[in-house]
């Protein structure tokens, strides 16, 4: 689960980190009034969406005119912002963040992730702030400095000082950086974050460190013990199909291919996508129906898959372990009849009562292609998607 910038900065402020005075606004009038409360003669207005690249897409504006703030809010509120990180439809803008303007002397990067290789929280800092860190990692990886947080000892001030020296900070900035580092590390651990970024972490013209942006990703599996964070969820930013799938405990991720995939088990689902790709097809989705492939869940899975107009064929790959294949076959037949599937459906069943399941499918009278193996299933569905 991701948080908006204004939500991230509210958390930063709770931990005593330096952030700009700002207000998240729902209407153009609120945005103008927010500028008045902030004071000064220059403000920054930002569209609040779960995507980067807002500035290049016109979603960020620096202005000294309150009427321009009103016009910006009128332009974007209720509209979709398309950036390089969104799909072609973009993300809906429901709030505008109005902030005081900060004079910048230099831009740095500070972030943290859960690193699966080291099984630790790893902090990263760089002098290359204000640009995509992925680009820095690819082109100049030596400019990214790391600190690994020991899960027993926790974050240590010496780690902050080590990063600060590598960033070329002066003694005053070093103290500020240490406070920011320790606060962020504690916040990361307290709230079960999976990702945290301040890009850029700026040095102002007065020589002080300031958190100019904030990006936070939370471990969705930990939300049961993070009620405060869970309440920050903005469903408008979710993919509509993924949100619908979650209601039925289906794990769905939309992709850009034309072969719909319905599988039970995440590992088998990834293997299915790989073999479809191996035989020249492009998966349209990842969809794990879980252990209980009931008629209702299979029906909803078909509806979700077929809501993607790019899908030209569907591959159902089920391993019957706890659930018998004949029961799964009956569920598939019922779902196909209920949904009215118009594209070719290839089914591969393996495991308990697999032969009986294949017989049930064959006697259904429906246009369902029963595959003999996973390779056969992949080849059949790729041909079907191509209209062969």
Swiss-Prot record:
Binding-site residues for ATP, renumbered to this chain: 46, 53-55, 99, 102, 107
Question: Which note does the record give on the cofactor?
Answer: Binds 1 Mg(2+) ion per subunit.
Question: What cofactor requirement does the entry state?
Answer: Mg(2+)
Biological process terms from the Gene Ontology for this record are: succinyl-CoA metabolic process; tricarboxylic acid cycle
User: What's the catalysed reaction?
Assistant: succinate + ATP + CoA = succinyl-CoA + ADP + phosphate; GTP + succinate + CoA = succinyl-CoA + GDP + phosphate
Q: Which domain of life is it from?
A: Bacteria
**Keywords for this protein:** ATP-binding, Ligase, Magnesium, Metal-binding, Nucleotide-binding, Tricarboxylic acid cycle
SUPFAM superfamilies reported for this sequence? Glutathione synthetase ATP-binding domain-like, Succinyl-CoA synthetase domains
- Chain ranges of the ATP-grasp domain: 9-244
Broad EC category: ligase
| Residues involved in substrate binding | 264, 321-323
Q: What is its EC number?
A: 6.2.1.5
Q: Which residues cross the membrane?
A: none
Single GO MF annotation: ATP binding
| GO CC, any one term | cytosol
Binding of Mg(2+), residues? 199, 213
Q: In which pathway does it act?
A: Carbohydrate metabolism; tricarboxylic acid cycle; succinate from succinyl-CoA (ligase route): step 1/1
The subunit field of the Swiss-Prot or TrEMBL record says: Heterotetramer of two alpha and two beta subunits.
Q: Which family would the database say this protein is a member of? A: Belongs to the succinate/malate CoA ligase beta subunit family.
NCBIfam families found in the cross-reference section: PRK00696.1, sucCoAbeta
Q: What does this protein do?
A: Succinyl-CoA synthetase functions in the citric acid cycle (TCA), coupling the hydrolysis of succinyl-CoA to the synthesis of either ATP or GTP and thus represents the only step of substrate-level phosphorylation in the TCA. The beta subunit provides nucleotide specificity of the enzyme and binds the substrate succinate, while the binding sites for coenzyme A and phosphate are found in the alpha subunit.
Per its record, how is this protein called by name? Succinate--CoA ligase [ADP-forming] subunit beta
Q: What is the gene name?
A: sucC
């Amino acid at each position: 689960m991701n948080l908006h910038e204004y939500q991230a900065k509210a958390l930063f402020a709770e931990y005593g980190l330096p952030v700009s005075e700002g207000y998240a606004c729902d209407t153009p009038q609120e945005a103008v009034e927010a500028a008045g409360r902030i004071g000064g003669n220059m403000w920054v207005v930002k569209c609040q969406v779960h995507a980067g690249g807002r500035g290049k897409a016109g979603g960020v504006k620096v202005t000294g005119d309150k009427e321009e703030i009103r016009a910006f809010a009128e332009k974007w509120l209720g509209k979709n912002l398309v950036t390089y990180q969104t799909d072609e439809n973009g993300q809906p803008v429901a709030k505008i963040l109005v902030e005081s303007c900060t004079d910048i002397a230099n831009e740095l990067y500070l972030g943290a992730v859960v690193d699966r290789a080291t099984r630790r929280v790893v902090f990263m800092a760089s002098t290359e702030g204000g640009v995509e860190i992925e680009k820095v990692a690819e082109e100049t990886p030596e400019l990214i400095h790391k600190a690994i947080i020991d899960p027993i000892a926790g974050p240590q001030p010496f780690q902050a000082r080590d990063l600060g020296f590598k960033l070329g900070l002066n003694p005053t900035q070093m103290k500020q950086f240490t406070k920011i580092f320790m606060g962020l590390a504690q916040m990361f651990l307290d709230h079960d974050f999976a990702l945290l970024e301040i890009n850029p972490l700026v040095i102002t013209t007065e020589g002080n460190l300031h958190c100019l942006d904030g990006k936070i990703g939370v471990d969705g599996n930990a939300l049961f013990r993070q009620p405060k964070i869970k309440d920050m969820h903005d469903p408008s930013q979710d993919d509509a199909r993924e949100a619908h799938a979650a209601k039925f405990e289906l794990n769905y991720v939309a992709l850009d291919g034309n072969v719909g995939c319905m599988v039970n088990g995440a590992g088998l689902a990834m293997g299915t996508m790989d073999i479809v790709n191996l035989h020249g097809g492009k998966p349209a989705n990842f969809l794990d129906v879980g252990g209980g492939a009931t008629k209702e869940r299979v029906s909803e899975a078909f509806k979700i898959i077929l809501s993607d107009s790019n899908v030209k064929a569907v591959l159902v790959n089920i391993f019957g372990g706890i659930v018998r294949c004949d029961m799964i076959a009956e569920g598939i037949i019922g779902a196909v009849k209920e949904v009215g599937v118009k594209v070719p459906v290839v089914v591969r069943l393996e495991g308990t009562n697999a032969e009986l399941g294949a017989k049930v499918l064959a006697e259904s009278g429906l246009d369902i292609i029963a595959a003999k193996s996973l390779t056969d299933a992949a080849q059949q569905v790729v041909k079907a998607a191509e209209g062969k």
